[in-house]
């Protein structure tokens, strides 16, 4: 799907291991799972933190992968 999308962490719950990123371009909020956070070498995401990510689709739903801190 799309690559190098800029977004802001809307919320991330490290207990539930997921959250959502608000796309800077105004698109739909994107699901982010702990596996993507771990793969980026991060421990967690903070609300309001800017990230760059790629979109992938699985079972008809978009989710963030290849996270990088902006």
Swiss-Prot record:
PROSITE patterns: CSD_1 (PS00352), CSD_2 (PS51857)
Domain CSD: 7-67
Compartment(s) where it occurs, according to its Swiss-Prot or TrEMBL record: Cytoplasm
GO molecular function, one term: DNA binding
Classification via InterPro entries: Cold_shock_CspA (IPR012156), Cold_shock_domain (IPR050181), CSD (IPR011129), CSD_CS (IPR019844), CSP_DNA-bd (IPR002059), NA-bd_OB-fold (IPR012340)
Keywords: Activator, Cytoplasm, DNA-binding, Transcription, Transcription regulation
Keyword DNA-binding found: yes
GO cellular component, one term: cytosol
PANTHER family per the UniProt record, alphabetical: COLD SHOCK DOMAIN CONTAINING PROTEINS
UniProt protein name: Cold shock-like protein CspA
Species name: Rickettsia felis (strain ATCC VR-1525 / URRWXCal2)
Underlying gene: cspA
